[in-house]
């Protein structure tokens, strides 16, 4: 819901809700008021809540059923959904609810990155999705097939061949899927960075501010590096080895080891490039425009949930305009 609020506060249409995280009971009415195109449910209980909220809002909500079958892959703590073998009964139950209509099926992940060969491969889930969709079509339904996971234009052909009608671009929009880290000829270019500065030094290392130092663990451990710009001067920038606290710890700071002959000082700008997860951090989000034209400009500073961050320097620059 925090992400949905951010989308709506920006004036955008809400395409899909409840897919990764279900809508809490007490927020169902707010969710219905946002009029999402699709709303995913993991259970009949959640379907009933969504339907009732939609009915109170005077509309009929298209629901996607998350389905599963033996052999499917889930991230730990993200299991759930309807048994694909019972998808027809589940769809009938949903269609019987005032305020709801079964619009199709979804899963996650439909594709996963394979570190061994550097490709995005179909999971067993994608086959489950295809089978469930076929069963629904055979019953005379028009079916939407939502198939997210490692989504970028490089995966569209695979997903289309499996019958997908919807994808969730996610990191495809910022060019930060695992494929983009190892392939330099994809249409999308990496367009996200974590920018911070040096706080202090200790024991021969420099400590830069954390808050957004969560690296999505899609690769085996590797030596992280960061670009250090002395005093913000990128013409003099250099790479430094970095150590980031593990996910089990709070990322108060990242640690930088100066290369031989270099010094890292308080206030130096530090830039990391990794697969970010803004919603899972306390870092701010700053969209930049004008990069291709050579006139980059920060459009504002927002918290990860979409609220204006009222960052002092940006507020002062806006006031001077």
Spans of features found by a protein language model:
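C-terminal accessory subdomain/extension
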Residues: 205-321
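Generic structural signal for well-ordered, non-membrane alpha-helical segments
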Residues: 43, 47, 87, 118, ...
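A structural signal for short, hydrophobic beta-strand segments that form beta-sheets
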Residues: 14, 102, 198, 240-248
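Active-site-proximal beta-alpha core segment in soluble small-molecule metabolic enzymes
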Residues: 1-107, 113-114
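Active-site loop/helix belt of alpha/beta enzymes
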Residues: 69-186
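Active-site loop ensemble at the mouth of alpha/beta enzyme cores that anchors a bound cofactor
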Residues: 153-232
